[in-house]
Amino acid sequence: MKADLVVGIQWGDEGKGKIVDSMASAYDVVVRYQGGHNAGHTIVVDGKKIALHLIPSGILYADCKNVIGNGVVVNPEALLKEMKQFEALEGRLFVSDKAHMILPYHEMLDQAREKLMEERAIGTTGKGIGPAYSDKISRNGIRMGELRDIPKLVEKIMEYQEAHAYLSDIYGVKLLGREEITERMSDYAKRLLPFIVDTTKLLWDAMDRGQRILLEGAQGSMLDIDHGTYPFVTSSTTTASGACSGTGLAPKHIGEVVGIAKAYCTRVGNGPFPTEDFGSEGNLLREKGKEFGTTTGRPRRCGWFDAIAVRHACRLNGCENLALMKLDVLDGFPEVKVCVAYLYEGKEIDYIPYDCEGVTPVYKSFAGWDHSEGIREFDALPKSAKEYVLEIEKITGARVSIISTGPDRKDTIRR
């Protein structure tokens, strides 16, 4: 039995939560494998909105095990707050003992750096994700399993803070005292240790028993640390390859990869965004799509569907199937557009160059349509909406097998 994977193939906020939620009932285990509480899913069930930042979307199903893998960076405070939304989590939620911990000074450092960088700021959420991953890579990180030995953990944090006292001088970061560290870590241990396990072994055992596993990515492929619009990227591997290192599953155990994309494009924070619309159409997309960050509330930058970027991401991830989200948001536009090429240094190209900032989109226009909201059969879509979907398939080389026509679970077309 192989594990299936859901991955965002734009700049994040594609609607992965709804798709994972709709798929999760067919799986025994749902796993989050990278990122932190900077990412956010909003799921609508029977009209009720549920926001998830760390806990996998399978938590809404009583018989599903939910795993926060070793590739995730965990803010204990954020996790505990999120856990309060649910009851009886023991035996349903598991946190990797190898997942790294976000501490208060990571958040303070993240926010201070962004402020000092001004125009060169990445536009991070300020949640401490980057500094926590930096500590992990420099081998100075704190892992969740270290909550098993509080005295040793407190000494380690104190030593780290002493070695990095310059952070207080340069960035104004407030370092914690021994008493506060001990109190916080003891509280985290008391409340979280029942959930902290070797999740790699848990997943291996589940696979040996023939259980179905669904891997849930956070953010999007165009924010990948290696393949995204560097340096305006996140600090983890958001592409399918991150699912292996972030869980302990081997590449041969990865099955179907489903790419998630909106029917238009959005981006939060700074960085290249070739199809961004600065005028009334971009504003209307934002208004109709309610494009404001789940985590920060910041307005998202909006623009037309970039088929070149999506095809690039499909190839990075090995996506043969796409889920196209929020098609209904395009209802009522007199004309809709798809970017089918870029102009770069006087030439038309069909790939993403090194300097993505320097491209101009080449669009193909389609007549608009009036009503797709709530439609659940492909043949029932307006003619121009079907043509739009088929053009996306043609350029990206991936089949659009799922189309979302509204926020509820039921507002979904499967082909």
Curated annotation (Swiss-Prot):
Q: What is its EC number?
A: 6.3.4.4
Question: Which residues does IMP bind?
Answer: 13-16, 38-41, 125, 139, 219, 234, 298
InterPro entries registered for this protein in UniProt: Adenylosuccin_syn_GTP-bd, Adenylosuccin_syn_Lys_AS, Adenylosuccinate_synth_dom1, Adenylosuccinate_synth_dom2, Adenylosuccinate_synth_dom3, Adenylosuccinate_synthetase, P-loop_NTPase
The record's section on Gene3D superfamilies has: Adenylosuccinate Synthetase, subunit A, domain 1 (3.40.440.10), Adenylosuccinate Synthetase, subunit A, domain 2 (1.10.300.10), Adenylosuccinate Synthetase, subunit A, domain 3 (3.90.170.10)
Cited SUPFAM superfamilies = P-loop containing nucleoside triphosphate hydrolases
Q: Which coenzymes or cofactors are required?
A: Mg(2+)
Record-annotated active site: 13, 41
GO process annotations (BP): 'de novo' AMP biosynthetic process; IMP metabolic process
- Is Cell division included in the keywords of this UniProt record? no
Q: Molecular function (GO) terms listed?
A: adenylosuccinate synthase activity; GTP binding; magnesium ion binding
* Positions with a binding annotation for GTP: 12-18, 40-42, 300, 326-328, 404-406
| Compartment(s) where it occurs, according to its Swiss-Prot or TrEMBL record | Cytoplasm
Recorded hits in PANTHER family, A to Z, give: ADENYLOSUCCINATE SYNTHETASE (PTHR11846:SF0)
Quote the protein name from its UniProt record: Adenylosuccinate synthetase
Which organism encodes this protein? Wolinella succinogenes (strain ATCC 29543 / DSM 1740 / CCUG 13145 / JCM 31913 / LMG 7466 / NCTC 11488 / FDC 602W)
Q: Gene name, please?
A: purA
